[in-house]
């Protein structure tokens, strides 16, 4: 019963914040809880869901390469600008930090509660986005904007 109340509270907050991603995610999880056979699915989704999400985001990021919007000349140009190097370093930093984050979640599962709360606050109150790889882009945006750099 407590999990239903917790999910309902998250849904209300998402609705008040008009955050469609969180609304859909919460509704899907609540739907899963209603279905009798999903007891076996939930641990699998919990264990592999982040990787699935990263894969979907990676596919979306690679689409401009597939459509020809981004080519080798763009890659080479990246190495010629400070903003490009910042983007590369931000990507490396996020990948390395994520490795430590995954290890911490495995060692200290209680961190998940704080992360969920922080993510909900960030998404709803500050119009943030609950996505991992996009963090590198956000870090890049911050530094590029602070130093008025361009690609």
Swiss-Prot record:
Its main location: membrane. This is UPF0756 membrane protein LBA0919. Belongs to the UPF0756 family. The chain crosses the membrane at residues 4-24, 52-72, 78-98, 115-135. InterPro entries: UPF0756_TM. GO terms for cellular component: plasma membrane. The keyword DNA damage does not apply. PANTHER family: UPF0756 MEMBRANE PROTEIN YEAL. It is found in: Cell membrane.
